[in-house]
Amino acid sequence: MNTETGTISFGGALPFLDGVSFIDEFYPKFQVPISVVNDGKAAALSELWLGNLKGIENGLALVLGTGIGGGLILDGKLYQGKHFQAGELSFMMKQSDKVSFDDMYGRTGSAVGFVKKVNQELGTEDLTDGAAAFEAINQKDPIVYPIFEAYAREIAYMICNIQAILDLEKIVIGGGISAQAIVTEEIRTQYRAIRAGLPFVADTLTEVEIDSCRFLNDANLLGALYQLLLNVDEELVVNG
């Protein structure tokens, strides 16, 4: 998603948005400033502005949803990359005998997919019922809690790999399931367990701080506002 032109290069689950410029579509009609930013980058912006990445030079907002969104803060600013594709963590690949999206982090780290697995085990009629899933998880249900631990471990491995490349100060967890405090707690627990099992890694690489987004699932909305303010008057917003 090009934040300069407002063009969506790939609409994902909404393919009718491929190649659409929101600025070209809406500005002639409404004649007001328009900004476009994806969810992961928006979450990072809001947390940098007023949240749990405020004052951080190098950090990451990791958004758990249908896939995994990411917003990188490098040198105190949102890093988007040459093609505005930095932080597209769903497309990180895992070793596999076959080339398949099933073996990419966007599938194995999907919060939606994880909730469905839990509800399948519980026999819940609505497989997308997050409340039912987390009621069982918070009660440490012996059948579904291992599924939750495995999911948190999957995210923790991703964090280990990201940290080996970027040496971040802090990572904040967002997305709908971040409203459940146990999510960030278990990811942190699994991350530390991985490091404990690999002493040479723990001795070499500094442990990154893992926290929840201050604004949880609303971080995306606030970050979109911040992007708009930056577009209108960056100097005023940054320098107050």
Identify the residue ranges that each predicted region occupies.
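Charged helix-capping and loop-helix junction motifs
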Residues: P15-G19, R153
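Glycine-rich phosphate-binding loop of actin/hexokinase-like ATP-binding domains
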Residues: K54-T108
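Active-site glycine-centered loops adjacent to acidic/histidine catalytic or metal-binding residues
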Residues: D39, G65, A224
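Acidic/histidine-rich catalytic cores of soluble enzymes
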Residues: A44
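Generic detector of well-ordered alpha-helical packing
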Residues: T3, D39-G40, L48, L89
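Short glycine-enriched, charge-decorated loop/helix-capping segments at active-site entrances
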Residues: I8-P15
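General beta-strand structural signal in soluble alpha/beta enzymes
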Residues: I34-N38
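ATP-binding/phosphotransfer module of carbohydrate and carboxylate kinases, centering on a glycine-rich
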Residues: N2-T5, D24, P28-V32, W49-I56, ...
